[in-house]
Amino acid sequence: MAEQEPTAEQLAQIAAENEEDEHSVNYKPPAQKSIQEIQELDKDDESLRKYKEALLGRVAVSADPNVPNVIVTRLTLVCSTAPGPLELDLTGDLESFKKQSFVLKEGVEYRIKISFRVNREIVSGMKYIQHTYRKGVKIDKTDYMVGSYGPRAEEYEFLTPMEEAPKGMLARGSYNIKSRFTDDDKTDHLSWEWNLTIKKEWKD
């Protein structure tokens, strides 16, 4: 039996319902300071120095200036019932993602995991922004506040709250997703597009 495609009116209705759930936060970011400036502040205060070291680690501020401060390495769809890994390597050819698609079974619970590194300076107010399109119509926009992070050798991981994949005949089909990783300074650390296909079963 052929899948029933949603009409333009139904897509507009979905977009309107999702728009009602969007909230803008009136937030003014603090003035940015470099790691070196933070380490120099109150450097004679031993307890404060130890606190900063615990917070920031022993940071080498002379990191290669040619390497981006923030590198987003992977996007993973975390789903306990998935038959295999659902992962995008964001250090490679981003254009290739437009030609492939994740398959997600309708109604399953999943989370999005973003893996990233911070190399030199503290980054304040990082956000993961996701716009979802169906047949060229934007039906959803979600902003996730990732937070502020300092440099370290190990990768950080950010997990979105648990979500449920859409379900039902009208929900099945292909979705185009435009993702962006940004911060308080509106620096575009990485933007990429990827595709998601909602199916009745993992493989049908």
Curated annotation (Swiss-Prot):
Covalent cross-link (Glycyl lysine isopeptide (Lys-Gly) (interchain with G-Cter in SUMO1)), residues: 138, 141
UniProt keywords, alphabetically: Acetylation, Cytoplasm, GTPase activation, Isopeptide bond, Phosphoprotein, Ubl conjugation
Highest classification ranks of the organism: Eukaryota, Metazoa, Chordata, Craniata, Vertebrata
Chain positions of cross-link Glycyl lysine isopeptide (Lys-Gly) (interchain with G-Cter in SUMO2): 138, 141
Name of the protein: Rho GDP-dissociation inhibitor 1
UniProt-listed Pfam families: Rho_GDI (PF02115)
Distribution of this protein across tissues and organs: In kidney glomerulus, expressed in podocytes and mesangial cells.
Source domain of life: Eukaryota
Gene: Arhgdia
UniProt subcellular location: Cytoplasm
Subunit-structure text: Monomer. Interacts with FER. Interacts with PLXNB3. Forms a heterodimer with RAC1. Interacts with RHOA, the affinity is increased by three orders of magnitude when RHOA is prenylated. Interacts with PSMD10; the interaction increases ARHGDIA association with RHOA, leading to ARHGDIA-mediated inactivation of RHOA and ROCK and prolonged AKT activation. Interacts with KANK2; the interaction is direct and may regulate the interaction of ARHGDIA with RHOA, RAC1 and CDC42. Interacts with RHOC. Interacts with CDC42. Interacts with NGFR (via death domain); NGFR binding decreases the affinity for RHOA.
Keyword Acetylation: yes
Phosphoserine PTM positions: 34, 47
Example of a GO cellular component annotation carried by this entry: Schaffer collateral - CA1 synapse
Function: Controls Rho proteins homeostasis. Regulates the GDP/GTP exchange reaction of the Rho proteins by inhibiting the dissociation of GDP from them, and the subsequent binding of GTP to them. Retains Rho proteins such as CDC42, RAC1 and RHOA in an inactive cytosolic pool, regulating their stability and protecting them from degradation. Actively involved in the recycling and distribution of activated Rho GTPases in the cell, mediates extraction from membranes of both inactive and activated molecules due its exceptionally high affinity for prenylated forms.
